Amino acid sequence: MVRQRKKRGRPVSGWVIFDKPKGMRSTEAVSQIKWLFHAQKAGHAGTLDPLASGLLPIALGEATKTVPYVMQGTKTYRFQIAWGEERSTDDLEGEITHISSKRPTQEEILALLPQYTGVILQTPPQFSAIKITGNRAYDLAREGKVVEIPPRQVEIETFKLIETPTRERSVFEITCGKGTYVRSLARDMGRDLGCYGHIADLRRTTVAPFCEDDLITWEELKAVALDKIAINENGIPSERNFTKIDELLIETGAALKCLSHYTLSETRAQ
């Protein structure tokens, strides 16, 4: 008889709408939240690049079953493109690969935006989690290999130029569907404008049905979870009372609010 392995942690369920800081990986954020809630199970609904900040929905327990629904939800990003340089990662982290002295005018940028609105074809960055013959594209890129990544359809519902604080940079906001790479937008727009570009700053503000009002920071979570609790020399709480921190969770069913609802007539319902 096979002995069933006992699950570690609490069977707590719900959503933490985490305000991920720059520099933290999405998987690291999940591990930290799982530890803080002492949850048996945890997962996130859409990776955010380490250099990006903002809304990262993290599901605990039974809420992990609703992750696919949230991943289908629309997302909003506010980002800054730095003109004049294209980089290997399409953001600040990579090496400079192309340089231009040209800077786009506001009129040129506005004229280009309609081409990037609606359903478009987009090629993901070389440094991405896309699998190529069983390997992650970013692993191959780190080995110096240039891989052929097929373009894919993505949908951008709205694309706004918010401001151009300097000739070097422009701030945008988009609402888009699943699978959209903002870094690819910076790369492709820079090429179309003849000046090159990369992402200088990126923040996600919504993942339907969650928004900025739902955000909570690591500092806020930690303050509630560890308030008046002794920490031993290994950084582990000596005793825990999860009542207060559990009150910060958004109910599991909230994830289903992004699903389409249909009204059936009595005849069709039968």
Swiss-Prot record:
Keywords: Isomerase, tRNA processing
Catalytic reaction annotation: uridine(55) in tRNA = pseudouridine(55) in tRNA
MF terms in GO: RNA binding; tRNA pseudouridine(55) synthase activity
Gene3D superfamilies: Pseudouridine synthase
Active site, UniProt feature: D49 (nucleophile)
EC numbers on record: 5.4.99.25
Pfam families listed in its UniProt record: TruB_C_2 (PF16198), TruB_N (PF01509)
GO biological process entries: mRNA pseudouridine synthesis; tRNA pseudouridine synthesis
Family the entry assigns: Belongs to the pseudouridine synthase TruB family. Type 1 subfamily.
Alphabetical list of NCBIfam families matching this protein: TruB
Function: Responsible for synthesis of pseudouridine from uracil-55 in the psi GC loop of transfer RNAs.
Protein name per Swiss-Prot or TrEMBL: tRNA pseudouridine synthase B
Organism: Bartonella quintana (strain Toulouse)
